[in-house]
Amino acid sequence: MSRVGKLPVAIPNGVTVTVTPDNVVTVKGPKGELAKAMSNKINIAVEDNSVVVTRDNDHKDVRALHGLTRALINNMVTGVNEGYVKTLELVGVGYRAQLQGKKLVLSLGFSHPVEMEAVSGVEFEVEGGTKVKVKGIDKELVGAVAADIRKWRKPEPYKGKGIKYENEVIRRKEGKTGKK
């Protein structure tokens, strides 16, 4: 049995989980509502303040889906209850971020500013011009938007300049020594 899959997902107060016969899981909470279609090879049941995920057989693909389905449901419950935040830091001379309405404008050393529209379900917050917070209830979407922002200037190993996650550690390299 899957170590992750056999644990029930606790449903906190204020959160409701419904499962349709074709395995569409809908989670409603104080921050919003998420719905996701799960595989029909997995059985999902809501039993007194918890969601229990089980499987019928032990085929390799079904075993893999067991833990995945439980983790996805857990992420949905956490998202509608608390939400998710990814913080990015801009490191470099002249690297700045600012908000124009719902649009994030980044100055990253290009000849033009980089503009990113907020996808529905995600909002941006800028702290001090060098920290960008990506907030939302869908963990996958928050991570994808944060990765798209980071993609514009990945941190380089010599000076550490670029866009990095808040807790990310950049492996540094020594530069050339040169002749003397």
Curated annotation (Swiss-Prot):
Pfam families to which the protein is assigned, alphabetical: Ribosomal_L6 (PF00347)
PROSITE patterns, sorted: RIBOSOMAL_L6_1
One Gene Ontology term from the biological process aspect of the record: cytoplasmic translation
GO cellular component: cytosolic large ribosomal subunit
InterPro entries, A to Z: Ribosomal_uL6-like, Ribosomal_uL6-like_a/b-dom_sf, Ribosomal_uL6_a/b-dom, Ribosomal_uL6_bac-type, Ribosomal_uL6_CS
Gene3D superfamilies cross-referenced by the UniProt entry: Ribosomal protein L6, alpha-beta domain (3.90.930.12)
Domain of life: Bacteria
SUPFAM superfamilies given in the database record: Ribosomal protein L6 (SSF56053)
Keyword set includes Membrane: no
Keywords, ordered alphabetically: Ribonucleoprotein, Ribosomal protein, RNA-binding, rRNA-binding
GO molecular function: rRNA binding; structural constituent of ribosome
SUBUNIT field: Part of the 50S ribosomal subunit.
Function: This protein binds to the 23S rRNA, and is important in its secondary structure. It is located near the subunit interface in the base of the L7/L12 stalk, and near the tRNA binding site of the peptidyltransferase center.
Record-stated family: Belongs to the universal ribosomal protein uL6 family.
Protein name: Large ribosomal subunit protein uL6
Upper taxonomic lineage: Bacteria, Bacillati, Bacillota, Clostridia, Eubacteriales
Gene: rplF
